[in-house]
Amino acid sequence: MQAEIKADIIVEAMEVLVNHILYVRGIYPSHIFKMKRMYNSPIYVSIFPPLNNYLAGVLKSAQELLRRRELQCLELIVYQKENEKLESYKMQLETQRSGLPAEDHLMEFEQNMRSVIYKISQRLNQAPKLPAGSCQFKVHLHTTQEAFIRFSHDSQYQEFPWLQTQKTESQATGRTVYLLPLARVDDLGLKMDVLIVN
C-alpha cells in the first residue's frame, strides 16, 4: 500500500510540473489553462480535453511503472521538427529506501514543490522564447526493457503507442546548450533538470 501512496504523490507532482512547464513556456495558449492552488502555491492546469487525455494516459502508465519500481525518468521534450529538440525536461527518479516520507517530511515536500514551481517560473521566464505557435511536445517514459515489452503488449496501456527510442546525440551543432538543474525533492527521490538548446 505504501508504494501505491508514494507513486500517487510522485505522479501528482509530475502532473503539476508538466502542466506548469507547458503553461510557462507557452506551448499552448494561456487561455486553455486555469489557475488552481496546490502545495499552497498558484499553479496552472490544462482544461483542454485532448491535452488532458494525453497526459492522463502518460501519467497512468507512469504510475504503474512507479508502483513496480520500473520508472527511471519522465522526460518532456519540446520540439519544432521531429528530430530538432529545443528543450528537454527530465524528472529523474533516484533509488532510495522504501517507504513513505514521514508526516513532517510531507510538509517539507510541499515546501520543496512550492520552491520548484517558483524556480520553474523564474528560470524559464528568462530563457529564450520559443517560436510562437510552431512548437510541439511529447513525453517519454524511461524504463527497463522488460517493462517496455510488458506494457507494449498489455491491452489496458494501448491508448497510445509504446515505442523504443534510440539514443541519439543532440543535434545542437553551432547552437548553445544550457543545462539548468531546477529542483531536487530528496524525500521522494525526484530530481529535475532542464536542457535548453538555443
From Swiss-Prot:
GO BP term, example: DNA repair
Highest taxon of the lineage: Eukaryota
Database matches in InterPro entries: HORMA_dom (IPR003511), HORMA_dom_sf (IPR036570), Mad2-like (IPR045091)
Keywords from the named record: DNA damage, DNA repair
Keyword flag DNA repair: yes
PROSITE patterns found in the cross-reference section: HORMA (PS50815)
Any one GO cellular component localisation term in the record: zeta DNA polymerase complex
Domain HORMA: 4-196
Family: Belongs to the MAD2 family.
Function, as annotated: As the accessory component of the DNA polymerase zeta complex, involved in translesion DNA synthesis (TLS) and various DNA repair mechanisms. Promotes the apurinic/apyrimidinic (AP) endonuclease activity of Rrp1 and is therefore likely to be involved in the base excision repair (BER) pathway responsible for repair of DNA lesions. It does not appear to influence the synthesis activity of the catalytic component Dmpol-zeta.
Subunit structure as annotated in this protein's UniProt entry: Accessory subunit of the zeta DNA polymerase complex, which consists of the catalytic component PolZ1/DNApol-zeta and PolZ2/Rev7. Interacts with the apurinic/apyrimidinic (AP) endonuclease Rrp1 (via the N-terminus).
This protein's name: DNA polymerase zeta subunit 2
Organism of provenance: Drosophila melanogaster
Gene that encodes the chain: PolZ2
